[in-house]
Amino acid sequence: MQKHNIPFHEKHKGQLFCDRSAEDLIQMLLAECNGSANGGNVTRWQPCSLKDIRYSDAAPEAQRYEVDTGQGTVHAAAVVVATGGLSIPKIGATDIGYRLAKQFNLRVVEPRPGLVPLTFDDKAWAPYAQLSGLSLPVRIETGTKKTLQSFDEDLLFTHRGLSGPGVLQISSYWQVGTDLRINLAPEVDLAEALMAAKQHSKKLIANELNAWVPSRLADTWVSQDTAWQRPVIEASDKALNLLAQRLSAWPLTPTGTEGYKKA
C-alpha cells in the first residue's frame, strides 16, 4: 500500500480501509502483475475457463501439470489454486477448489460457513428480537480449556440472532450444539458495582445498569425477573448477584448460522 502511495486508515481494531476506493487495490495488483517497479511478470487471461488439470510423473519437471483452459493448454511445474470458498454464491462462488483437492487426494477439512452471523430458535430468541439494531462492545467466547476462543469486539443484535465483528470472529470456532458465553459489560465487575450502588442508590435497577449497558438492553434484562424490577437499594444480594452473573456470562446455544450466503 505504501509502496504504491495508496492512502488507507484503520477503521476498527486492525480493519484497514482505503481512503478513496477499493479500486486502488485492484490497480495496485494489476501494476504488480504487469511488471511495475519491483513487480512481477504475469500473463493474465480474463475471462478464461478451466476445463481440466492433469499430472504426470513421467513428464519433464517443468511440464508435469497440464492445464486445459478456454484459451488453450498450459504446461507447468506447479499449479496454484486460489479460488476462494463457497461464500456468497450469488457472485459466482463454487466448490471447484474442493473438487480439485479431492482430485489430487489432498486432505480437506469439512467445509462450513465462517465469519457468519449466528441464528437462534425463534421462540427462544423472541425476548431479544426487539433489540435488533443494538450494538455494544462485549467479550464473547466458546469452547473450554484447550479449545477456548475469546474475542473482545462489538456485538450486533438482529431479528434472527447475533452478528457484528465479535460474533463473526467466534463463528469460525463455534461448533454446532455447543454454547457461547457473552460478557455484555466486560469493562466492569457488575456484581461489585451493583453491590456498591445498593449502599446509596435509589434508582431502579434498570436505570443503574444504564451506566454500563445500553438502556434498551437493561430494560429487556430486568423484565425477565420481578426481583430486578425495583430500586437497587431494595434488591436482595442474591437477586443482584444473579443479574450480574447473567449479564457477565450470558449462556447461549445457537441453532445455526446464516449460511454461505452471508459468510
Please report, for each region that a protein language model flagged, where it lies by residue.
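Short beta-strand to alpha-helix junction loop
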Residues: 12-31, 45, 88-92, 119, ...
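A conserved beta-strand/loop element that lines the FAD pocket in flavoprotein oxidoreductases
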Residues: 33-50, 111
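A glycine-rich dinucleotide-binding beta-alpha-beta segment and adjacent secondary-structure elements
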Residues: 45-47, 223-263
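A conserved short coil-to-beta-strand element within the FAD-binding core of flavoproteins
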Residues: 46-63, 116
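Short hydrophobic core segments
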Residues: 50, 74-93, 100-102, 154-160
